[in-house]
Amino acid sequence: MELGTERIRKLLVQYAVPAIIAMTASSLYNMVDSIFIGHGVGALAISGLALTFPLMNLAAAFGSLVGVGAATLVSMRLGQRDYETAQRILGNVVVLNLIIGISFGLLTLVFLDPILYFFGASDATIGYAREYMSVILWGNVVTHMYLGLNAVLRAAGHPRKAMYATILTVTINAILDPLFIFGFGWGIRGAAIATVLAQILALVWQFRIFSDRNELLHFRRGIYRLKGKIVRNVLAIGMSPFLMN
């Protein structure tokens, strides 16, 4: 896609339609989990799942902090034909998501029970919430990486591929949920494992795209060292969507 020469109206459609489809598919994520958990585990498990939503939103907010900021900077640098800086932004996204994803996951795991009780957990629901969220938090770095790379993928001129990554996670999650909950009898933990595995598979697909040296932005040596200016700009731009989440 020629971002610098294509007609604005055509670009708007090519970006807006995949984004709308991806957002619609993404909204089905928690709905699918809720349906299978409700039928396979019970009403208390649904209550436990609901307790995890604030933490899930916070994790997504940190993903937006890096993803939106990086995507904006990548778009600007590509428009300026500053491909070297755009490459370094990609590398910094990987490192930032590793740091934030691991830190958030481990820190929240340490204080998980007090946090869940703060959100209204009872003795009847804390077990379900803990069982689900502990798996999600161990895979939190995958979530951050997946969200960050998807934002950069879209900014690099591949809105359809970013949409496909989202649809892939939702579809795999919907397939694995009944298998793990009903087939293997893993209960609410099975739903969490399905979510993490779906994101891992999407992340593998993203890595394959960014490993292609024919891509304008691709993984290579020398781009993973954090640059203060890049990090500050990413966080400054991403702060607004972070706070909105």
Residue ranges and their predicted role:
Residues M1-A16, V74-V141, G185-G238:
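Short alpha-helical transmembrane segments in multi-pass integral membrane proteins
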Residues I20-T72, I136-T143, R232-N245:
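Transmembrane helix-bundle signature of multi-pass secondary active exporters and lipid flippases
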Residues L28-M31, G40-A43, R77-Q80, A155-A156, ...:
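Helix-loop interface residues and adjacent transmembrane-helix termini in multi-pass membrane transporters
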Residues S34, A71-T72, L112-D113, L147-N150, ...:
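Interfacial helix-capping/hinge residues at the ends of transmembrane alpha-helices
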Residues I46-L106, T143-A162:
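Small-residue-rich hydrophobic transmembrane alpha-helices
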Residues L58-A61, N173-P178, L203-F207:
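Hydrophobic transmembrane alpha-helices of multi-pass small-molecule transporters
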Residues T108, A151, D177, I181, ...:
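Structural signal for membrane-spanning alpha-helices in multi-pass inner-membrane proteins
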Residues I136-R154, A162-N173, A191-V204:
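Short runs within selected transmembrane alpha-helices of multi-pass transporters and secretion channels
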